[in-house]
């Protein structure tokens, strides 16, 4: 076991510290159809990154959401890959990571959430807390990620706001601190009252211009209140009194510790409430946080460059058949042409042409600091979980594989395309789209996923990106576990006795394939010295 080493002495670079302080790296999480993609577009609109929702700046055509760039996403209207978008607003530089919106893609979503310092949770005001929201909040809670809540679609027929807050608190186990409060709902939605600024923002449907300033009134005592909202004024006054009396006021320390979420109400499709969320991110969300490595904790303002790969994306540009490693900078400053140490292999590599993103649009990055996400052109040498440093032996922690819940075997329409099939599956496996296993008893690669849609996505990408027409059939496997044993002889005996149920993963780790839950339980009872793991760290060779 490696002993913890102290952090190296820091030279103290005021310019670096200033740049790091400006960064806000966050994700947007929600259940499918709660309005996550719309909010993503509107934040980019307010940040000046795009001119109108659905189109990248300077593009003359294309109606797809900026963040849904992959062909299969455009066809199906769901987010299946994680886009990265950088934009500025005020004095801050925002790195927005758009997570997959479909329930099948929890593993990729988890990896994205390891790379952020805060999150916006979007809740559909008509549906409240949904299944995917619960799962994502559990992931955020593992790292005490600060969460801002945006309750969306107030211009539709929705549930009572107090009921929604109670549901968030009781199901998600996080305290709510309302920052804005709705005035009416559905067709009678009139705007919101800002509890901290003592200001009423009046709603007007159909405003698509980010520069639009919604009409405002100063405070609940404004003489125009009853004139403008004759049907809602009394209810608003009583609700605000109730909220202030029973609800918790916003507390920055509780928010940063992940114990409290500030809550905003609005309508993303109409830009209403978006500016307030963006200002909250700017004012309250943390700048890049320290990161835990196996050896020590790395501070974001340390002068030496460090970071980790949290995602591999193949064929972002089909014309160039490229692969990009998404890399979270944890300390120091990136500059083109710099030499870094690849921790897993121990080899040095040069990063000459890193890029920054706007979904699939990219441009060369000439500078990046902690919190920034850069793309590194990758020809197979980088894997998810890899750490790069300026020489120090560090390995960042916290990017796991989960045991798949579904398993399939590929079936080729054309047997002569077997080489292309294997190449495609291995590359998609490295990317994290699926997990790929090589069974001891069969030459056919085995594919593991956390949801059935992943197999459809892989089949589509094999066809469009690798020219392989393949279908997938059930492999008859219930679950998988990574196995380790400190006794080499005992492990050899286990391997010999269970060879028909064993496979290797992409990193060469031993995996036990159980066709039923009973089979797994029996194996654990028969081999008590063997450990069966349902997760492992990326890039980790289990021993």
From Swiss-Prot:
Binding of GTP, residues: 30-37, 98-102, 152-155
The organism's place on the tree of life at top rank: Bacteria
PROSITE patterns, sorted: G_TR_1, G_TR_2
GO molecular function ontology, one term from the record: GTP binding
Coiled coil region boundaries: none
Gene Ontology biological process terms from the UniProt entry: regulation of translational termination
Keyword Cell wall biogenesis/degradation in record: no
Keywords from the UniProt entry: Cytoplasm, GTP-binding, Nucleotide-binding, Protein biosynthesis
Places the protein is found: Cytoplasm
Main location: cytoplasm
Keyword GTP-binding on entry: yes
GO cellular component, one term: cytosol
Annotated signal peptide: none
InterPro entries, sorted: EF-G-like_DII, EFG_III/V, G_TR_CS, P-loop_NTPase, PrfC, RF3_C, RF3_dom_3_sf, RF3_GTP-bd
Record-annotated tr-type G domain positions: 21-289
Biological function: Increases the formation of ribosomal termination complexes and stimulates activities of RF-1 and RF-2. It binds guanine nucleotides and has strong preference for UGA stop codons. It may interact directly with the ribosome. The stimulation of RF-1 and RF-2 is significantly reduced by GTP and GDP, but not by GMP.
Recorded family membership: Belongs to the TRAFAC class translation factor GTPase superfamily. Classic translation factor GTPase family. PrfC subfamily.
Protein name: Peptide chain release factor 3
